[in-house]
Design a protein with these regions (language model features):
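Phosphate-coordinating catalytic segments in nucleotide- and nucleic-acid-processing enzymes
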Residues: 50-257, 261, 322, 327-359
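Pre-Walker A-like glycine/lysine-rich segment at the N-terminus of P-loop NTPase domains
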Residues: 1-49, 60-65
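H-loop/switch region of ABC-family ATPase nucleotide-binding domains
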Residues: 297-299
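Conserved hydrophobic alpha-helix in the ABC-type ATPase nucleotide-binding domain
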Residues: 279-283
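Loop/turn-to-beta-strand initiation segments
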Residues: 258-260, 291-295
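Walker B catalytic acidic pair
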Residues: 265-267
């Protein structure tokens, strides 16, 4: 399995420092509102795609569609202090180490400068502004460290003027991010890949657990459709409710063998509680079958109880679980409090609150 052993975050959004150790195949993050759960998933995505200069803006767009401009990248910096570099580091399961640092800076652009001065009277004033986001990253393996840099720049009008890809680096891993916003998900790419590999039946089999009438899934014009017993035509998933759409998005991404890492924000969104246990079983089974690592956030107590029930019935998955309560403590800042299956089981049996610890 390719993936993460640990993750360390410094100065990213509201997280000054957070270290998460002993990551496993399926990792669930709990916590109160604004504890940093979603930020953890964003950091995992960024460090997996650290050579992609478009990724930071895409991450912001997923979080809030109205904050997808270059200027909004400042929200990734602590308290909008652009002089403090966010850093994300990790040790991977293949014993390589990764480090990514984000930096806002000014890079002189001859073309933009010429356009700005065209037809104007030259002055001695230097007009500069932060126009470039640099993604400086390192890969260390067997004592050898390699450094790379990607960047994206804008002109005076705020439009992207240049992008620089890291030379000599090719990312071998792929992460799929499933946001809390139900409207943002589309399983088309995953289903197309599964169709090419003749593995689409894996998804149909799991969809039958959600609704036993489902007998097919198809992609037409980038839209997902399902076939159902007793109905003569395919039905658009988007017209069948949030529950099926959410379930299909997660199952298709989990089944796609090209995705090494699955990131699911607020897994319970759009789903009726009766589907939770079936979905947990699908996630663990597909992660094992396709050898991938999964990261999930939730604030639903019912979701945790159904997870416990599923693991009671499927003991083969118990060792694969890690549960982390993320807490911004008064004395120690952000902390990750870890539990394994035994801790989850005990908490559910004794009605112990896991989603937030007041310290």
């Amino acid at each position: 399995m390719d993936g993460f052993k640990n993750l360390e975050i410094k100065n990213f959004r509201g997280i000054e420092h957070l270290k998460i150790d002993d990551l496993s195949r399926v990792n669930v993050f709990l916590g109160q509102n604004s504890s940093g759960k979603s930020s953890i998933l964003e950091c995992l995505l960024l460090i997996m795609g650290m050579s992609n200069p478009d990724l930071p803006m895409n991450v912001n767009a997923v979080r809030a569609r109205n904050f997808s401009n270059f200027a909004d990248l400042g929200y990734m910096f602590p308290n909008y202090h652009l002089s403090i570099k966010p850093e994300i580091s990790s040790e991977m399961l293949d014993d390589t180490r990764r480090l990514l640092a984000l930096e806002m800076t000014y890079v002189f652009d001859e073309k933009s400068a010429a356009e700005q001065q065209n037809g104007q009277i030259p002055t001695s004033e230097t007009k500069t502004f932060l126009n470039t986001l640099k993604l400086a990253f390192e890969i260390e393996s067997q004592g050898k460290k390699n450094t790379f840099e990607s960047s994206i720049s804008i002109n005076q009008a705020g439009l992207v003027s240049s992008k620089k890809m890291a030379e000599g680096y090719l990312e071998k891993n792929s992460a799929a991010f499933l946001p809390a916003d139900l409207a943002a998900g589309n399983p088309a790419n995953d289903l197309v890949e599964l169709t090419k590999r003749k593995k689409k039946d894996m998804v149909v089999e799991r969809l039958k657990h959600f609704d036993p009438r489902i007998n097919a899934v198809e992609i037409l014009n980038n839209v997902a459709y399902v076939g159902m017993d007793g109905i003569d035509q395919l039905l658009a998933v988007n017209m069948m409710g949030d529950g099926l759409r959410r379930y299909l998005n997660i199952v298709a991404a989990s089944a796609n063998p090209t995705n090494n890492i699955i990131l699911i924000d607020e897994i319970d969104n759009g789903l009726h509680y009766s589907a939770y246990k079936k979905l947990w079983e699908a996630i663990f089974a597909l992660a094992a079958d396709t050898n991938k690592q999964v990261f999930v956030t939730t604030h639903s107590k019912e979701t945790l109880y159904r997870l416990n029930e599923m693991l009671e019935e499927h003991s083969e998955y118990q060792d694969a679980l890690r549960l982390y309560t993320i807490e911004n403590t008064k004395l120690k800042g952000h902390q990750a409090y870890k539990l394994t299956y035994n801790g989850l089981h005990e908490a559910c049996e004794n009605n112990i609150e896991l989603r937030g610890i007041v310290l």
